[in-house]
C-alpha cells in the first residue's frame, strides 16, 4: 500500500500514468517502443491500458498496476539477495 501512496503523490493522483512518463521514470534504459515490445512479449509483466481500441490510442499504466509491478520487483530482488547469502538483515517496508 505504501508504494501506491508514493506513486499517487509522485503523479499527482493520476489514475493512469502516460506510458512515456512510466518509461522515463522507471525504464530509463528503454525507449517507449522497446518497453511496449517487452510488455507484448511477456518480458515485462506490466499491463498497458489503452484509452480506446485503436492502435494509435493513448497508452498508459494504471497506478495500481505500476505499484504492484514495483512491489513484485522489490520482492524478487529481496529473494535473490537472500539466495546469494547476503550478510545482514533485509529490511522490508
Where are the model-predicted features located?
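Major-groove DNA-recognition helix of helix-turn-helix-type DNA-binding domains
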Residues: 2, 25-60, 81, 85-90
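Polyanion-binding surface elements
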Residues: 3-34, 69-72
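Residue-identity detector for glutamine
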Residues: 10, 55, 72-73, 83
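Helix N-cap / beta->alpha transition motif
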Residues: 18-19, 47, 62-65
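C-terminal structural segments of small proteins and small subunits
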Residues: 66-79
